[in-house]
Amino acid sequence: MSWIERILNKSNITQTRKASIPEGVWTKCDSCGQVLYRAELERNLEVCPKCDHHMRMSARARLHMLLDAGSEVELGSELEPKDILKFRDSKKYKDRISAAQKDTGEKDALVAMKGTLQGMPIVAASFEFAFMGGSMASVVGARFVRAVEQALEDNCPLVCFSSSGGARMQEALMSLMQMAKTSAALAKMQERGLPYISVLTDPTMGGVSASLAMLGDINIAEPKALIGFAGPRVIEQTVREKLPPGFQRSEFLIEKGAIDMIVRRPVMRQTLASILSKLTHQPQPSVVESKADTVAQPENQADV
């Protein structure tokens, strides 16, 4: 028997169980590295309260943030992707679809809904970047066109939140065709004189930026969002030159006149309501309690 065992009475020694912390309770800001409480970050609309970095947000969370509670009606939810080409790279396309559906709970990379924004009828769509990089494929194009058709039927504006890496390579020409398909649908909105507001979030690239994302009557971007066709790393390798600081970011684009506004996420809903009321010649909506009223303000920053 060791000396410590002789000193301590075994009957008085109690076993302690190591407390375990469930996964997903904490997360880290991609920009400042600050450790953040997950529930608090969700209440803050995925905006870091320390540095104001706008993290990626799910499609449904964006639409619920925008539309009045209880007014949301989903459009095109019955549409599902199909592996028409039997495509396979390092993995079968159908397996990639199944994995993405399991991870996100979505059938494809775009969610569309109709509802009201402070009482104004609107149709809204949002890309789900977690679903295969928000890539545009047949179902994405079909749902977007369904959203346009609903806006035409209801004679109301359309708002789209873009967050995509571009066209989905696994559907080849079928995905590239969606660029023309969505652009043609938006031309009908223009003919009817109905507003289309495009909100560009991080990242908006490739075929999406070359079609529906940049065709808004007003193009709004979130702060520091990456927006372009090819990525900066690809461009640098092609031209063999160093790109200027902030190239393809929202602040760079607005300086060059490529976009119209940069709006922080906490004030996005009220800003869209104000713009749409002017474009549709409706009374200016009163400032009501917003879904973002509890959003923390970053240090030394004001709303844009």
Swiss-Prot record:
Q: In which pathway does it act?
A: Lipid metabolism; malonyl-CoA biosynthesis; malonyl-CoA from acetyl-CoA: step 1/1
Q: Where is Zn(2+) bound in this sequence?
A: C29, C32, C48, C51
Instruction: Give Gene Ontology CC terms.
Output: acetate CoA-transferase complex
Key words of the record: ATP-binding, Cytoplasm, Fatty acid biosynthesis, Fatty acid metabolism, Lipid biosynthesis, Lipid metabolism, Metal-binding, Nucleotide-binding, Transferase, Zinc, Zinc-finger
Question: Some GO term, biological process aspect, for this entry: which one?
Answer: malonyl-CoA biosynthetic process
Entry's EC annotation: 2.1.3.15
Residues annotated as signal peptide: none
The record's note on quaternary structure and interaction partners says: Acetyl-CoA carboxylase is a heterohexamer composed of biotin carboxyl carrier protein (AccB), biotin carboxylase (AccC) and two subunits each of ACCase subunit alpha (AccA) and ACCase subunit beta (AccD).
PANTHER family (UniProt xref): ACETYL-COENZYME A CARBOXYLASE CARBOXYL TRANSFERASE SUBUNIT BETA, CHLOROPLASTIC (PTHR42995:SF5)
What's the protein called, per UniProt?
Acetyl-coenzyme A carboxylase carboxyl transferase subunit beta
- What organism does the UniProt record list as the source? Yersinia pestis
